[in-house]
Every structure is written in structure tokens, then in C-alpha cells.
Amino acid sequence: MKKLIFCLILAMLSQTFGSFGQEKTIWKIGENDNSPDKMALAPDQYRQFLASDFGYEDNYFLVGHSKAEKDWPYVLPGPANDWGGTATLSGIRANFLNINFELKQKPSSGNWKFTLDILQTDPVNAPLLQVIMNGKAWKFKLNKGNGSKNPEGDFSNAKEQLISIDVPNDLIRAGNNEIVITVPEGGWLAFDQVKLEGPSETRLDLPKEILLKNITAANYETLLNGKNFQPLLIDLQHIKGSPSIQVKLDGSVILSQKIEQGRYVLEAPMPEVSAEKSSQYEIYLNHQLLRKGEVKRAPKAIKTPADYVNTMLGVAHSRWMIAPGPWMPFGMVKLSPDNQNTGWQAGYDPAFESIGTFSHIHEWTMTGLGTFQRQAR
């Protein structure tokens, strides 16, 4: 009997330790060595953060392509830090660090953990850390640091803080995944390491020429050559080269396009349907199958050119803001010159502020006309 109990305990222990052993580091940025030296701008070039093009919403660190020493800053400023873009004339600036990683294979079950090893924080203004993974957000109020006012010098005696997030398995997906790290309140934080752990069967994919971010059916129809189409929206990011994309719907080619630079949201025209219907799509990169899946189609309302207008687009980093007013029709929208270099920003950041009723007319002046931003149809 004692022998049986001993064997049962041994079996349970082996299963327990075996389950721990099934997790592995999927990817990491930096080393857990209490030093930021292997990251960009380290150890004291924090004032070059904006000039080095860090913090902008459309920049990203792509696992498998980007290099920490060049593409990941050792420090992330908060709105309390003037060197991060916040100033009296320019308003409050939010900075973002985006991580994209693509999974070739995602296990149906398993444990995932995202870890931020924070080496040091602002000793005056404790940062509020926000992490957004595939749309789900977590917030953490960090403690004030024990070092100098600015992130420079020796970090050997730093007050390290470890943030671990148990990520739900259903939040991770095959294909592209995105993590956004920002500090909406408080001051700076310095990184020691950022990493993701997951099941040992997980396989990273390394996109070569494009990053396929998302594929979905549009909730509208467009008019093309007198016919209605419901677009298949293909959100992708150019990486390198001049690759060609081909989209097939139920075996028929509906779009062919060369990808050259930047981010695209392609509208592949799916013929309109009179009732809900499921179809199969295939996406080819340079004539090689990249992704396939099912899309649900349905009748939708027509989208006009005015519906594409976003009156807030770009305002967070524009020198003179949006300029509607009595000197031009209220239904029109005009973006005034973005005449500052990349290390300076002005305008209104929608992460903090909202534009109510005012109008900028010709210059850096607000008037009380009570003009709302809108576009005509």
C-alpha cells in the first residue's frame, strides 16, 4: 500500500514538473542582466528618443527582423517628461512602443506569460504602465525609482520592478499578434528585458516581405464601374522589396497589386450578395500561398467618399492643427502645414484631450466660434 501511494505521488510530481517544462521563451528583447546596454540609446541618450523616431504610433518592433540595439529604446518617457515631447506650447504627448510577432502554429491549450522587467523608473513621477495585447488592456501603477531624475548613468543599484501578465490562451492567435506598451500618466521607465513565454509547441513565423496584420469583410459596400462590391479588407505592412499580392475569392482573382512602402488596407472587391454567404479566400505573395480562410459576406450600405474622411487623422503631431472656419465652407476639412521636424510635436493628442467647439483660423490662435469638426456627405 505504501509503495502504491509513493508511486502515485511520484507520478503526480512528474506531471507537475513536466507541465512547467513545457513552457519556453517564445521571444525576448534584451537580457535579464540589470543593464540596458544592448538596447538603442543606452545608457544615456534618452534626449534623442523623438529624434530617433521612437514613440510614434505607426512604428513597430517586428520579432525576427528588428534588432534591440537599433530598434528598441532602453527607455520609454511618460507625459511628465519634456524630452518625450510634452511642453507648454505643444501639449501632452503620448509615446507608444509596438511589438508585432507572427505565429506559424499556436497550440490549442497552454500557459502564456508576458513579462516586463523594469530596470528603473522616474523618481519624481511614478509611471502608470499600460500594456495592450491584441486589444485587451492591463494597467499597472509602478513605484517611484531610486535613481537620478533622468534615465542616465549607472543602473547597477536600480530599484527593479517585475510585471508579469498571465495571458489567456484564446487571446493569442495564429498569424499576427500585436502588443502596445505606453505610459499614459507619470514619468519614464527603463527596460531590462521584455519577453513572452508560451507552450513548447509554439512556432514563430518570420514574415519576409510583408506583415499580414488582419483580414476581415468590410461593413460597407463600394461602387466600382457601376457595380456594387463588399470589400475584403487586407491590413498589411510592407517590410522590404516590391512584392506582389494576389487575392482570390472562391478561386477567382479579385485583386492584384504591388506593395512598395508603408502600411496598406487593401480593398479586394467581393461581388455583392443578396443574402448572407460564406466564401473562401486565398492570399498569394509573389505567387506563393500566404494565407487562406473563410469570409462571411452579407448585403451592406454603400460607403461614399465622404465616409473615408477622418477629421482627426494626424492632428496629434501637426503644427497648426485642423483648420475649418468661416474662411472656408464648414463642410470642408483642411490640414494646415506640418512644418516642424520629427523631434517636435504640437496639436491635440486624442489619448488625453478631445476637441470641442473651437476653430483655428490662419494661425496659432483659438477663437470662440464653436465650430464642430465634421465632413459633408
Language-model features, listed with the residues they occupy:
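Contiguous beta-strand segments within globular domains
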Residues: 91-101, 107-115, 217-235
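Beta-strand-rich ligand-recognition modules
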Residues: 22-109, 117-203, 259-271
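Short, compositionally biased P/S/T/A/G/V-rich stretches that sit at domain boundaries
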Residues: 194-226
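Positively charged n-region of N-terminal signal peptides that target proteins for export
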Residues: 1-4
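Short, aromatic- and glycine-rich surface loops/edge beta-strands on solvent-exposed regions
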Residues: 178-182, 247, 276-287
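Accessory carbohydrate-recognition regions in carbohydrate-active enzymes
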Residues: 227-231, 238-243, 261-263, 270-284, ...
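Bacterial N-terminal signal peptides
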Residues: 7-15
